[in-house]
Amino acid sequence: LLRGALALGLAALTLTAYWGLWRCDFVEYDDREYVTGNPFVRGGFTWSGIAWAFRSTEVGNWHPLTWLSHLLDCQLYGLKPAGHHVTNLVLHLGNTLLLF
């Protein structure tokens, strides 16, 4: 019972942190490198994009799952920030619940 209440509380906290995402734009911190200014990501979920995701070290990191997520976001939502933010919310909620 305590474990379930704690999981629910953490999920609620995560939802609270992301609540304003519906009206937010892309941010200037790193979204240009990761999404809006990246031709591979903007091209969506393609075979060449998938191959690029696994060999890319752009932004100084090798993280193909992050790139695959961005590729899929652009495929599904284009450059509409709310969709990208919803994906982040789902991923963070999933990670929160994986604690249990």
Question: For each of these PLM feature ranges, what is it?
Answer:
Residues 13, 29, 87:
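Single, functionally critical "micro-switch" positions that shape active/binding sites
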Residues 14-21, 74, 99:
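Structural signal for membrane-spanning alpha-helices in multi-pass inner-membrane proteins
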Residues 1-16, 97:
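Start-transfer (signal-anchor) and selected internal transmembrane alpha helices
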Residues 86-100:
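Transmembrane-helix motifs of polytopic, lipid-linked glycan transferases
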Residues 10, 26-27, 84:
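Residue-level signal for helical boundary/lining positions with a hydrophobic bias
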